[in-house]
Curated annotation (Swiss-Prot):
This is Probable potassium transport system protein Kup 1. The gene is kup1. The lineage of its organism: Bacteria, Pseudomonadati, Thermodesulfobacteriota, Desulfuromonadia, Geobacterales. It is a multi-pass membrane protein. It is found in: Cell inner membrane. Its main location: membrane.
Length: 605
């Protein structure tokens, strides 16, 4: 399994801070504050919670993602779709492949649903820091929500311009943010040096023993310290493994030092409503406003990384045929992976603002937050067990099993959040999940309903018609495979006698590798008939027109099929609506409109 190590220099590490760690890096704004609204901040409880935070970040982020998951890259790429492709290549059993496919569908859906709640809670929690500024204590909840919504609208409104111009500043800003977290945490912790003893897992066991079942359900809030940990693996393709892992060591230290400082502040100021903001204002009141500005910038960067991550996941889903085609715009001439999906962007913005309006406070959002990410972690763990069980490193499957059981324990604890709004995570995740199921099954059913003709049978009639005299020029026909002929091609050539001097069947095959483009021109499969096969990785941006020119194919007209679906099945009706509302293949690949000719085929499903 190929691993791209990446740039582990200081520049690469700083860049990773801005691109990967925004989500987990803003967790200190709300994590302990939420926990200690539910749990009394006694000395024993604080030590127990801080112990749980340390071991949660160690096991679920460092071990699960930085160590295990990031060893399973493919050409440097990571994520649950990558794990699915690895399993499909390793495993031959149909049921296990189907199970892995289903898990990846659920995992991707949970991550997309999480992409709504994360920007909402990050921005809202930062804006709530305004309440600690003298003179602004009386700001209403509605005003705070309006400010947070305005920031979100501004962020989503500039996505179409791309982020490459300002992305260079993300890393340095986040470096300042993490350094500030570390320094403020140390300053607070110095007043109670024994707080470092919280690392001892015995404090966590004592907390469970003293609090019983209530202590177990606190895990549903403790997990907030690790939300965003999955980004280490998902974003591996952008930077490589080494800079992300090295950055994580610094981020881990900065985060935990801040949590220790907040723990001390919670013990000495049990009445505090927001631990991070209260601690910083107590330490340096004159610098509180600059810190608040830095906090808002950090949450904007965190939200930007989530938005970019959602774009990337959806693009992977499109290219692997899990999701319908959507219009994709490329926001950078130099970096093809920087993309903008308008439909996703505006849908995400509406959902984020809706969530802000529904929950109104970050503590309310925190009550709904965590189920999706723990579900995703558990699914990643199960998929890693399958992968490692089919490799020579079978002992890692045992380690992955232990971690997955811990994931499952956290996931089970989050079920206590369902009455408090966690069902919104499930509702949000169900939208992409249902879309994936309908789209994948619909495509399969449509392909069978079309009843393509095998090439040998097609060639018998084709050769007879070609002998009568073809039209001058070159005609291109898109097919799923060069060995079978779709009905629209049969209609064009056999029934309508539209045949050119040179006819080329073009097929685009998505491989199970993330990157790489290969082409093969097969000449003479019939008189005046060639086949052009493109094999591309599922993360590649394929310029079909450029590939045609590079292989000397100058088309006069490009034919493609348009299916007119007739059905009584309600699922296939939804599938038909998806087909009508989304771009078709040639529109997605931006082929020249003046040369396109759609051929309608009526299909009974």
């Amino acid at each position: 399994m190929d691993q791209h190590k990446g740039d582990a220099s200081l520049g690469g590490i700083v860049k990773a801070l801005g691109l990967v760690f925004g989500d987990i890096g803003t967790s200190p704004i709300y994590t302990l504050t939420v926990i200690f609204t539910l749990t009394q901040p006694t000395r024993e409880n604080v030590f127990g919670i801080l112990s749980l935070v340390f071991w949660t970040m160690t096991i679920l982020v460092t071990m699960e993602y930085a160590w295990l998951a990031m060893s399973l890259g493919r050409k440097g790429q990571g994520g649950e779709i990558v794990l699915r492709e690895i399993i499909m290549k390793l495993v031959k059993t149909g049921r296990l492949v189907a199970f892995a496919g289903f898990l990846s569908f659920v995992g991707v859906s949970l991550l997309l649903g999480d992409g709504v709640i994360t920007p909402a809670i990050s921005i809202l929690s930062a804006v709530e820091g305004l309440l600690l500024i003298p003179g602004l204590e009386g700001l209403s909840t509605g005003t705070l929500v309006a400010i947070a919504a305005a920031i979100a609208i501004g962020l989503f409104s500039v996505q179409f311009k791309g982020t490459d111009r300002v992305a260079g500043a993300f890393g340095p800003i986040m470096a300042v943010w993490f350094s500030t977290l570390a320094v403020t945490g140390v300053v607070s912790a110095l007043s109670m040096p024994e707080i470092v003893e919280a690392i001892n897992p015995w404090h966590a066991f004592t907390f469970f023993r003293e609090n019983g079942l209530a202590g177990y359900f606190v895990l549903s809030e403790v997990i907030l310290c690790s939300t965003g940990g999955e980004a280490l693996y998902a974003d591996m393709g952008h930077l490589g493994r080494r800079p992300i892992v090295k950055s994580w060591y610094f981020v881990f230290m900065a985060l935990y030092l801040n949590y220790l400082g907040q723990g001390v502040f919670a013990i000495t100021h049990p009445e505090a409503k927001n631990l991070l903001f209260g601690m910083v204002r107590d330490q340096m009141p004159t610098l509180y406003i600059p810190f608040l500005i830095l906090t808002i910038m950090a949450t904007i960067i965190a939200s930007q990384s989530i938005i970019s991550g959602v774009f990337s996941i959806v693009y992977q889903g499109i290219t692997t045929r899990l999701l319908p085609l959507m219009r994709v715009d490329y926001t950078s001439r130099e970096i093809k992976s920087q993309i903008y999906l308008g439909a996703v962007n505006w849908s995400l913005m509406v959902a984020v603002i809706l969530v802000m309006l529904l929950f109104r406070k970050s503590e309310n959002l925190a009550a709904a937050y965590g189920m999706a990410v723990t579900g995703s972690m558990t699914i990643t763990g199960i998929m890693m067990i399958i992968v490692f069980a089919h490799t020579t490193k079978k002992w890692r499957a045992l380690v992955a099993l232990v971690i997955t059981l811990i994931d499952a324990a956290y996931l089970l604890s989050t079920f206590s959040k369902i009455p408090h709004g966690a069902y919104w995570s499930l509702i949000l995740a169900s939208i992409p999940f249902v879309t994936i199921i309908i789209w994948t099954r619909g495509q399969r059913s449509l392909y069978h309903a079309l009843k393509p003709l095998d090439l040998e049978t097609f060639l018998i009639s084709y050769e007879q018609i070609y002998a009568k005299g073809p039209i001058r020029g070159t005609g291109l026909f898109f097919t799923r495979d060069t060995d079978v002929v779709p009905p629209y091609v049969v209609h064009c050539i056999i029934r309508s006698n539209i045949i050119y001097e040179r006819n080329v069947f073009i097929s685009l095959v998505i491989t199970d590798e993330p990157l790489g483009v290969e082409t093969e021109l097969i000449k003479g499969i019939g008189p005046g008939l060639d086949a052009f096969r493109i094999e591309a990785g599922y993360m590649e941006v394929v310029d079909i027109e450029a590939l045609l020119k590079a292989n000397g194919i100058q088309e006069k007209v490009i034919f493609y099929g348009v299916e007119d679906i007739s059905t009584r099945n309600p699922l296939w009706r939804v599938f038909s609506v998806f087909k009508k509302l989304t771009p078709n293949f040639v529109q997605f690949h931006k082929l020249p409109a003046s040369r396109l000719q759609g051929v309608v085929t009526r299909v009974e499903m």
